[in-house]
Each structure stands twice: as C-alpha cells, then as structure tokens.
C-alpha cells in the first residue's frame, strides 16, 4: 500500500529463503571463483534497477545472522556493495522489515492486578531479545500491529468494495452483493 500511494515500486524478499549462510551469496552475489559469480546478487541487482523503491524484507528474524551485517552497511552508509565491489545506492529506498518476533504475546492479556505491561510492550521486549542492539539502534521506528477489530475490517472491506465498484462502473459492469 505504501509503495502504491507513493507511486514507487515494491521490492519484496522473503527472508525465510535466506536462513542458511550460503544464501547470502544469492543477495549480494557469489565470491570470485564460485559458480554464479558473473550473475550478481538478487538484492544488489534489484536496488540498482529500482533505487527509488520500498524494500520489504519479510520475516527478517528468519534470515541468517550474517545478513544483518549486510543490512548494517545499508542503514549506516546507504550503500550496498556486491561481490564485484559495485555499490548500490540505497539513499532513496524505504527499508521496511517485518517480524513475527514477539507475536506469541499478541493474544496474552496482562497478568495480575498491578500489571502495567501491555501486549505491545511485551512484544517489543521479545524483539529486543531476538535482534542485536547494534541492529535495533539503527532502526527509525518499531511499529506493533495489533489484530484488526471486526469494525475496522468492515470499514476496510467497504472501502475496497467501493473502489472496485467504481472501477467496474467505468466498464459498465455493476456489482451487487447479497
């Protein structure tokens, strides 16, 4: 939605595909002498092709720990260097990372009469246990998403149905839901 509203591309990587150490080469390219050296990396190539984008790293907690070192380079210097030493300019991308770290606390109510810890705070506490401080300190913000209420889901659905109805009307098609 963000990329669409900004009129820029969304580049998405499912980080569960990068759990093993050797998969880092898929992102930035294989080292010299290895198969695929000439191919470059999926991430570095994507950033070079669309430097003005929303880069979504989905389920970041599943990525191999060495990938976080690569991301530190992006967050510190707005540059990502591939296997051949070519630099990808990251100054104009919006980096968003999703995580399910702490999700187990989403449905837990506070325990005890004097409990001051909200589910959001419990979730963020787990995030701090999952990721290293040097990684977390480079993030602009951490946003906790709570379950959508039935009322909110109805509002979203109504809006989407209105938009669909408007598009269909342009093609002289009517939509009737019962």
Which residues fall in each region the model found?
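AAA+ P-loop NTPase nucleotide-binding core of proteostasis motors
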Residues: 1-178
